[in-house]
Amino acid sequence: MISSPIRILGIDPGLRRTGWGVLEIDGNRLMFVGCGSVETREHMALASRLLAIHAGLGAVLDQFRPSEAAIEQTFVNKDGVATLKLGQARGVAMLAPALFGIAVAEYAPNQVKKTVVGAGHADKAQIQAMLKILLPKADPKSADAADALAIAITHAHHRKSAALAARMKAVG
């Protein structure tokens, strides 16, 4: 049985910059498709910033037509207001693929780092170095786009167990 390539959208949510990365998996091969970021300005009203994130990701979904999506889980920091705003951006970022009928898998930051680099406490430079090895055609212009590609790679490696867990959760 020949399977067709699967296209995955990785999302690194943020209110200032939401990174996105698209790759395809064909068997064990990872292929870079595209990456970038949706940027908002601090002077914009919160609702306008959230709308810009939604519209930007909607355009990415229209252009690249992924069949699966993954997003990084939010960590809680000492600044409650910043955490809340990040959560709002993350919610909008999850809504965009959901409106296209695409389930969104979630991965902890340490799991992304461990999958891509082999260490759960890797820094951004280590992640970017491994991206050059895993996806040599990728040239992310921002750390957010690089992180989004790392999230997509993580999903490519864990997608079968994530799908099984989602089915088990739905069954109850």
Swiss-Prot record:
Superkingdom, natural source: Bacteria
PROSITE patterns per record: RUVC
InterPro entries: RNaseH-like_sf, RNaseH_sf, X-over_junc_endoDNase_Mg_BS, X-over_junc_endoDNase_RuvC
Entry's EC annotation: 3.1.21.10
Family: Belongs to the RuvC family.
Record note on quaternary structure: Homodimer which binds Holliday junction (HJ) DNA. The HJ becomes 2-fold symmetrical on binding to RuvC with unstacked arms; it has a different conformation from HJ DNA in complex with RuvA. In the full resolvosome a probable DNA-RuvA(4)-RuvB(12)-RuvC(2) complex forms which resolves the HJ.
Protein name, entry field: Crossover junction endodeoxyribonuclease RuvC
Annotated organism of origin: Nitrobacter winogradskyi (strain ATCC 25391 / DSM 10237 / CIP 104748 / NCIMB 11846 / Nb-255)
Originating gene: ruvC
